[in-house]
Design a protein with these regions (language model features):
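Primarily recognizes Gram-negative and organellar outer-membrane beta-barrels
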Residues: 1-388
Length: 388
């Protein structure tokens, strides 16, 4: 059998926010107003093919294909103040009010921004499952395979103007930052995994399960960025926003777009991940209770190549993740049930976050990698009792 699905979405979100910070005395009050429009279409086609060569063997094949495209346009205003701006005005983000508050020495910074983005993604893959029963007591062996390939691209135009009222330039004027960038990012992804699971009945209602899974992930991204932050202020003020209308902005630039290529903001990255996953589980099914306990050990090797901010990176990381699990369900009666769930999980920091690179493309949101980031271990425990 098979299925086909199409989904269309439209979004219009207008948000306003007022914040008072009781920790920082400088810039204790902030306001923002944002308008975000979105639209998207997605298509998904799936098939299911099943074959039973005999009564003990079951083979399933599930091909799937998908396509999606999404548009976004966003505009926003924000400002930070030394005092509550609503004492002076009901509209603290208006340009006239900001000028009045600036004269009173209340302004810390202000920002106006807009962006237009488009993304397109295509993927194809298939899943294979082969299950073989070895006896009537529950002994069986299962082979799972999965291959998926995706190809995507995105275009993004972003423009921001930041005014720092308490930071002066060499001439004693307020510092003003203008950031105008256009980027194109093609991305390719490969994912392949294979899993072999063996279940052995120990005694009636009790099973031991051993599983091994190998996963290979590959991702390649090559973002090309053009920076035209040095153009005259107000060049794009008369351009109306619209979906995919970046050419209306780029057409106002002098010369060719290639003249504005920015190597330091462009980014090439290649990521390969080899994951071995070994699981050992114990399962007990009785009349009044069920018990599941197990542990997963996951050694993995990651290879990461990146060219960004004029820094070349070529590194390899080897880590081991551990995840114990415990689930218990006891049925006192038809109306009363007790459930206990526990799961522990090791999490590794993203390799890009470990690089000692400073990203100051947004003066109000400067990011810096931390090579000293350590793995984390999360414990999740849930106790649930139900009766009626």
């Amino acid at each position: 059998d098979g299925s086909a699905r199409w989904n269309h979405s439209d979004g219009d979100v207008h948000s306003t926010q007022s914040i008072e910070n009781f920790v920082n005395k400088s810039g204790a009050f902030s306001n923002s107003d944002n308008h975000n429009y979105t639209r998207g279409d997605s298509y998904d086609v799936r098939f299911k093919l099943e074959w039973k060569p005999d009564t003990l063997t079951d083979i399933l094949l599930r091909p799937q294909f998908s396509y999606s495209e999404n548009d976004t346009q966003n505009s926003g205003l924000s400002a930070t103040y030394n005092d509550n701006p609503y004492i002076y005005s009901d509209n603290p983000l208006s340009s006239s009010v900001i000028e009045e508050l600036k004269a009173e020495g209340m302004m810390v910074n202000s920002r106006s921004n807009c962006s237009v983005a488009y993304s397109e993604s295509k993927s194809a893959g298939t899943k294979l499952q082969i299950n073989r029963k070895l006896n009537k007591m529950g002994r069986n062996i299962t082979l799972l395979g999965n291959v998926i390939y995706s190809d995507s691209k995105s275009n993004n135009l972003s423009m921001a103007n930041v005014h720092l009222y308490q930071v002066k330039d060499r001439l004693g004027n307020d510092s003003i930052y203008q950031t105008n960038r256009y980027s194109m990012t093609p991305t390719k992804n490969w994912k392949t995994d294979a899993q072999l699971t063996y279940s052995e009945p120990l005694w009636r209602g009790t099973f031991l399960q051993l599983s091994y899974k190998f996963t290979y992930n590959y991702k390649k991204s090559d973002r090309v960025t053009y920076d035209f932050s040095d153009v005259e202020s107000g060049l794009f003020d008369n351009v109306s926003m619209g979906y995919r209308n970046w050419n209306s902005y780029l057409g106002l630039l002098q010369g060719n777009l290639s003249d504005y290529y920015d190597k330091s903001q462009s980014c090439y990255s290649e990521y390969k991940n080899y994951i071995h996953e070994i699981q050992l589980g114990f399962k007990m099914v009785k009349k009044n209770y069920n018990l599941n306990a197990g542990v997963m050990v996951q050694p993995q090797t990651s290879k990461f190549i990146q060219e960004y901010r004029n820094v070349s990176t070529d590194t390899v990381r080897n880590v081991v993740n551990v995840s114990p699990t415990f689930e218990f369900k006891y049925k006192f009666s038809k109306q009363s049930t007790l459930r206990i769930n526990y799961r522990g999980m090791t999490s590794q920091p993203d390799m890009a976050d470990l690089l000692d690179i400073t990203d100051d493309s947004d003066p109000l949101n400067i990011k810096k990698g931390n090579p000293g980031l350590k793995p984390s271990f999360t414990n999740n425990f849930r106790l649930f009792y139900n009766t009626y």
